[in-house]
Curated annotation (Swiss-Prot):
The lineage of its organism: Bacteria, Bacillati, Actinomycetota, Actinomycetes, Mycobacteriales. Its EC number is 4.1.3.1. The gene is aceA. The active site is at C193 (proton acceptor). It is an enzyme of class 4 (lyase). One of its GO terms (biological process) is glyoxylate cycle. Involved in the metabolic adaptation in response to environmental changes. Catalyzes the reversible formation of succinate and glyoxylate from isocitrate, a key step of the glyoxylate cycle, which operates as an anaplerotic route for replenishing the tricarboxylic acid cycle during growth on fatty acid substrates. Substrate binds at S93, G94, W95, G194, H195, R230, N315, C316, S317, P318, S319, T349. It catalyses: D-threo-isocitrate = glyoxylate + succinate. Inhibited by 3-phosphoglycerate, 6-phosphogluconate, phosphoenolpyruvate (PEP), fructose 1,6-bisphosphate, glycolate, oxalate, and itaconate. It comes from the Bacteria. Keywords: Cobalt, Glyoxylate bypass, Lyase, Magnesium, Manganese, Metal-binding, Tricarboxylic acid cycle. This is Isocitrate lyase. PANTHER family: BIFUNCTIONAL GLYOXYLATE CYCLE PROTEIN, ISOCITRATE LYASE/MALATE SYNTHASE. The keyword Manganese applies.
Amino acid sequence: MSNVGKPRTAQEIQQDWDTNPRWNGITRDYTADQVADLQGSVIEEHTLARRGSEILWDAVTQEGDGYINALGALTGNQAVQQVRAGLKAVYLSGWQVAGDANLSGHTYPDQSLYPANSVPSVVRRINNALLRSDEIARTEGDTSVDNWVVPIVADGEAGFGGALNVYELQKAMIAAGAAGTHWEDQLASEKKCGHLGGKVLIPTQQHIRTLNSARLAADVANTPTVVIARTDAEAATLITSDVDERDQPFITGERTAEGYYHVKNGLEPCIARAKSYAPYADMIWMETGTPDLELAKKFAEGVRSEFPDQLLSYNCSPSFNWSAHLEADEIAKFQKELGAMGFKFQFITLAGFHSLNYGMFDLAYGYAREGMTSFVDLQNREFKAAEERGFTAVKHQREVGAGYFDQIATTVDPNSSTTALKGSTEEGQFHN
């Protein structure tokens, strides 16, 4: 019988946990025997998830003040342009999936209203686009990008339910090829964007269960998925229960009509929660309301006073009015200073949404008033970017693989007379 897909034994799993530096400082509230029992007799290979996780982990654990930064993408082609331009990771936010890329086909606010398998679907779409670009580049002998299939960090939201929902969602993320996932400590049924009001926290222990479930799914799948814990305690004013003694110092005693408890928000509960999450998370993210380096520093120092090697993440959010808070020179060095504090993964959650919407509005505004002049201005900027910065999508037929599939056709039939790119307007007007 073939050994392909053979599951690991409990002894092999335990040895990996005990000897692999990847798991230094990580706590699991389950045993290797339990993981082995859950595997089944055949384990699928998750090449993209494993490879991406390893690349991401290597990037965020490099020595010094370096960091990896990413932009939120909501389409495959946006991710391709990010990698072509030089970024080394892609971020996928639930907000953008809710707004314009979910499987229901509707536009939603960031309140977990869309089908739960939507984010894994977009992860798969982005990976497919990156794989296609890699294939195109390889057939053309284009080595300008050293790694097309970069890690994708995807939004698990509040898990869309309890621990079992988290487990299944994490499995779907891994199958789609996500390198990392993040999970927030809000009540899933009341989930809100981190920059909206009305957020309801869950007890600290309940979120530890979420993180434990996400890790378990990765262990069963045999992938070193990067698990990121997010806390919304800086702004949230409600919590479901007073059952966890770690939350009790922040509970005011007041109740709402729904039965929720009022809590004191701010830096202190964020640090307390982060310390509780640290043994279960590879990275920790505190959602904030402004781009505040001093707040970030206090958070990092508070967490690292007990967990000195804890890696951190930071949302450089479009919900901040950056120029209203910081001068140009402060903005220019913002990410570098965060990196020095230990914020090793930094991302702009809604970059794709803003780029897509403003880009089309700007073109349409000009087109409505100037006709073809507006589009030709765009095309000329594309030509200039192609000449000076390596932009390739001005050759749109080539960008989506017309030449690549021509090569497949001529491999099957060297005498094929029906190839697509040869004789096209693109070949005649753009390939010179």
